[in-house]
Amino acid sequence: MPRGQCRQQGPRIPIWAAANYANAHPWQQMDQTSPGVAYTPLVDPWIERPCCGDTLCARTTMEQKSTASGACGGKPAERGPLTGRMPSSRPHRVDFCWVPGSDPGTFDGSPWLLDRFLAQLGDYMSFHFEHYQDNISRVCEILGRLTGQARAWAAPYLDGDLPLPDDYELFCQDLKEVVQDLNSFAEYHAVVPCPLPLASSQLPVASQLPVVKQYLARFLKGLALDMGTAPRSLPAAMATPAAFGSNSISRSALLEQQLTKESTPGPKEPPVLPSSACSSKPGPVEPASSQPEEAAPTPVPGLLESANPPAQRPDPAHPGGPKPQKTEEEVLETEGDQEVSLGTPQEVVEAPEGPGEPPLSLGF
């Protein structure tokens, strides 16, 4: 096989970084076997990742491939110091070196610095389950270098409150959003202050007393207008807060009693009934023409007559004096005698005209 084809099948020759790139770029790796030798990563961590997260494993593989390609050309290649070395379960990268003057919390506004940090973090978060547990301590160590807003975001992972996610891409994407956009951090982690709720769901009674007083005053006014009485002001007993603390039964009884007093008129004399209504045995109603005096009897209550002393009564012997008023008993006796004596018109005609004259006969 031609020598050029063998070179095309092998990997590219690593390009050593220039001095300015090595000084400006914080991503520097140290060879553990030969200290002091600095080199750039042989593979881009965002394009091609090693199998176990170890860069030594990748370099050993490349050296073995170079040896195989050299053997194809018939010229053995020199083996490096790491040729044939088994990859270790723990990565041998040194800790990430921050650029002087940069803030790990905001990364000093340098997106490339954040990308390199996430790249190193991704090397320790292996895709193989057998290396994942060994790399957790290194991941936490890298997260511990964060400060500011990013440190607050990584605190649950460092404290053990949240487990490290299995999906590393989402983990890095979330961290990148938090570091670059502080508003997203405030959205997910800010504590919104809220006032403490009241011990009771009901509002305090003291603040509602003026409203209750106005409502009761309007209620009493409307009720007084319906009852036809003059409206009265709110009682002082109901305006005090102590009245609201009593039971509702006593309040309603007090209100009803006051409304009853308002609707009841003042003391009046009992109505004077006619003498005919006072009789226990009602008689037949006679026409007004036959009994003109009894049709409209003079209502004289017995209480007024009994209150007058006997000395003030007029003397019946004097003809010029006023006619003495009859008592209620005399009126009843007179009415009874008249009812007995009254009869048909024929009986009235047959009655004797005088005490000494004989009765007149109508027959001729």
UniProtKB/Swiss-Prot annotation:
Which residue intervals make up region (Disordered)? 67-88, 258-364
Quote the InterPro entries the UniProt record gives: DUF4939
Taxonomic lineage is:
Eukaryota, Metazoa, Chordata, Craniata, Vertebrata
Q: Name one GO biological process term.
A: mitochondrial outer membrane permeabilization
Which segments show compositional bias classed as Pro residues?
311-322
The question of whether Iron is a record keyword is answered with no
Q: What is this protein called?
A: Protein Bop
Q: Where in the cell?
A: Mitochondrion
